[in-house]
C-alpha cells in the first residue's frame, strides 16, 4: 500500500498495533475520530485536541476502531470526574465531556445533518436548551439481572456485549429509582432467586423495571420473569412496600422467549394499581409499565413548550397530532386550540390517550387507532382542515407516504419533533421539495451525558 505522502510506503495496520494519533472530531455517537494514513479510526473516551496512544481493535477497508492506551495531551473540555463504567456501558457515553461542550456538540450534530443531508446552511440553529442539573434525571430504569461472581447482580451490559457490569449508582437515573433497584436486588438475593442465564436459558428473573413520577413521586416496580410461578411474592411485596411507601404498583411480566425484548405479552399486577400517575405541563397522566412516556420530565416540558411556541396557535386552530402515543403532546396543545386530532397505530396507547383526556377533563381532543396516512385521508374527507400537523416520529423518521399524506392536508405549518437529526434532515429536504420552508430549529437536551439529541423544527408552507 502506498501512502498519500509521495513515494513513502506504509505498513498495513493490524489488530493490537499501537500508534500515536491526534483526535480531530467526535462522531455522531460521541466517539473520538482519528485519521491515520488514509484510515479513519473511532475511539471511545477520546476528545478533539487530545493526543493518544491508540491500540487498534479492528481494521476495515478504510476505517477501524481503537481504544486509548495512554494520553499524551488532554482536552480542556474533558470531565475528569466521570466514572469510566458509565462510558464502558454506554449509560453516559458523553460523560467525559463537560456539559457546556455536550450542548455545543449537540447543536453541531443538528447543523451538520442539515447541511450534509438537506443542503441547508442559511437557517439559524439555536443553542441547545440544556438542564440546570444534568444528572439523576431519568424517571424510568430498565436493568438486566444476571449472575456475576456467584451472586445475583443488577447493572448494565458492557457496550457491544451481554457481559453484565454490576452497578449501584446509575448516574443519570432518579436516585430513588437506584435505591429501589438496589433494595430489590439485595432482597431477592436473600430469597435465593435465580437470575436469568441467557446462554443456558435457565433462571427466573430477567429484568427489573422501575418508573417514578417526577412530580407525584409514585413508583412502579416491574419484575420480568421467565415463568408465571414465582417466589414468595407476599413476603417480597411486604418488605418492598414497608421500605418504599411510594411504591403503589408492583407488576410481574412473563417473558419466556429467547429474545432481547424486555417485556413479554403477559402482565400481572401483584400489588396496588396497574399504573402510576404523573403530570406534565399541568396535565395528569396514567402511566402503565408499557406506556411511552418521556424519561426526562423537566426537559420534555421544555420540548413541548418549544413545539407549542413554534406553532403559534389560537383558539380557532385545528391540530393533527401524528404519532400521538398516550397523548402527552396533543393534550398539551389542546388547551390553546379549537381541536386536536391524534392518531397512533398502537391501540393500547390510544386507549391511554383517551383515558388521559378524560382524566384532565379535555373534551376537544380525539384519538384514533389507525395509520396516520389513512386517518388523515378520512379526516380530509370529513372536511377537517388542520392549521398545524405535529409529528414526533421514531428514530427512523417519516415514510414517504406519510409526507405525501400530510402535504395533501395543506397545513400552513408542520411542527416536527425529532430524536434523530439525520432522518429529520432527510425529511425536511423532502418537505422543502413539496413546498415547505424551514423556518426555525431548536435542539433540546433530553438526554444529558449521552450523544442523543432532540430537536424541534418549524416548516411553513410557501
UniProtKB/Swiss-Prot annotation:
Enzyme class, UniProt record, top EC level: transferase
Extract the PROSITE patterns matched here. Answer: SAM_MT_RNA_M5U, TRAM, TRMA_1, TRMA_2
Which is a GO BP term held by this UniProt record?
rRNA base methylation
Under InterPro entries, the record lists: MeTrfase_TrmA_AS, MeTrfase_TrmA_CS, NA-bd_OB-fold, SAM-dependent_MTases_sf, TRAM_dom, U5_MeTrfase_fam
State if Protease is listed as a keyword. Answer: no
Listed GO MF terms:
rRNA (uridine-C5-)-methyltransferase activity
Specify whether S-adenosyl-L-methionine is a keyword of the entry.
yes
Keywords (alphabetical) are: Methyltransferase, S-adenosyl-L-methionine, Transferase
Q: Which residues form the TRAM domain?
A: 12-70
The UniProt entry annotates the active site at 419
Q: What is its EC number?
A: 2.1.1.-
Check the record and name the Pfam families matching this protein: TRAM, tRNA_U5-meth_tr
Q: Which residues bind S-adenosyl-L-methionine?
A: 294, 323, 344, 392
- Superkingdom of origin: Bacteria
Family membership noted in the UniProt record: Belongs to the class I-like SAM-binding methyltransferase superfamily. RNA M5U methyltransferase family.
Check the record and name the PANTHER family matching this protein. RNA M5U METHYLTRANSFERASE (PTHR11061), TRNA (URACIL(54)-C(5))-METHYLTRANSFERASE (PTHR11061:SF30)
Name this protein carries in UniProt: Uncharacterized RNA methyltransferase SPy_1346/M5005_Spy1098
